[in-house]
Amino acid sequence: MSFEVPSPYVWDDSFRVAYDNLDSEHQALFKCIAKCAENRADAAALADLVKVTVDHFADEERMMAKTNFSGLPEHNKIHSEFVAKIKSLSAPLDDATVAFAKQWLVNHIKGIDFKYKGNL
């Protein structure tokens, strides 16, 4: 399922997962992807996206593990695949890569992360 990518590319309340720390981290991910989109040749922006993503996924998976969330194995696999993808990238980023990252985050939050709302 594909969800509409907001324009401008900013986090809004429609992405709220109801855990303040994760909502803040999701906001940071939106900002990192937007920065990469605006500065496609900026290797530091891409490195920051990788770091923020890895840190967020670790926090989210820790919360899932603490509550024995049944979707953790699938969620971990999805996270691992995305991290591998963004770690393989190098600047400058092309249009397709930027579009992929924007769409992936939107779909992931609304289609995957929403499954844990109220369960962590």
UniProtKB/Swiss-Prot annotation:
Transmembrane segments: none annotated. One of its GO terms (molecular function) is oxygen carrier activity. Fe cation 2 binds at E60, H75, H79, H108, D113. Gene3D superfamilies: Hemerythrin-like. Fe cation 1 binds at H26, H56, E60, D113. PROSITE patterns: HEMERYTHRINS. Pfam families: Hemerythrin. Belongs to the hemerythrin family. Myohemerythrin is an oxygen-binding protein found in the retractor muscles of certain worms. The oxygen-binding site contains two iron atoms. This is Myohemerythrin. It comes from Riftia pachyptila (Vent tube worm). The lineage of its organism: Eukaryota, Metazoa, Spiralia, Lophotrochozoa, Annelida.
